[in-house]
């Protein structure tokens, strides 16, 4: 009696433990059952797998080299039997000449139960157009960048520097060779300095400069002939024209007069004499 009661107690305890046990690792039997349930796939999943396998087989055949024999000919084409790649299965079909066939439809299909392998031309065309589109976009972007670079305005610099109207630049004259065998007249090569028009006009209007010019003009005369020039003495007087004052269009109004460190009046007179000598000899030479 004690044994039976002990067995009943053990059975109830084990049943309670299985019912109450929720924490910890699951038992092996439950794990195996769950794996079996998980391995069982739905029918829709199996159908999709079959369709994908068929599609893969069909796509694998596209683009494979074939070898075969023409079994018969007819007016619109040929009857062929070919092998695909290295497979041993023979395929037979009809090949039509260009312009002698109509697209297969329900009315003219002689074997509607035979599946047809359709070429994925749409996908190939789409991929090619996408690649072309990327290339064309890249070229357009590159062309627009080149055009934008080409349209950048470039400042044009003048070949010869311009001088403002209110400035006078003195010209250094080269020594002129006299035709009558005279010696060269020395020229004082002083550094070039720019003077404003107001200062130049003021210097030209001074009385000492005009009196000096009149004295030089009264001292000698030059005899000009068309054929030859005969000097009367070693020192020959030259005709000098009075300088004209240059009046600027827009005179510069200066608050404080700038100190002039230029040449003296004698050097300006020598320059004027040299210019006249060159002009007279140039006119006589021609």
UniProtKB/Swiss-Prot annotation:
Residue ranges with Basic residues bias: 20-29, 131-140
Summary of the knockout phenotype: Slightly earlier flowering time under both short and long-day conditions. Altered metabolites profile.
Compositionally biased spans, kind Basic and acidic residues: 1-10, 30-39
Gene Ontology biological-process annotations: regulation of photoperiodism, flowering
GO molecular function, one term: transcription cis-regulatory region binding
Tissue expression from the record: Mailny observed in young seedlings and in emerging leaves.
Function: Lineage-specific modulator of primary metabolism. Influences flowering time.
Listed name of the protein: Protein METABOLIC NETWORK MODULATOR 1
Source organism: Arabidopsis thaliana
Lineage start: Eukaryota, Viridiplantae, Streptophyta, Embryophyta, Tracheophyta
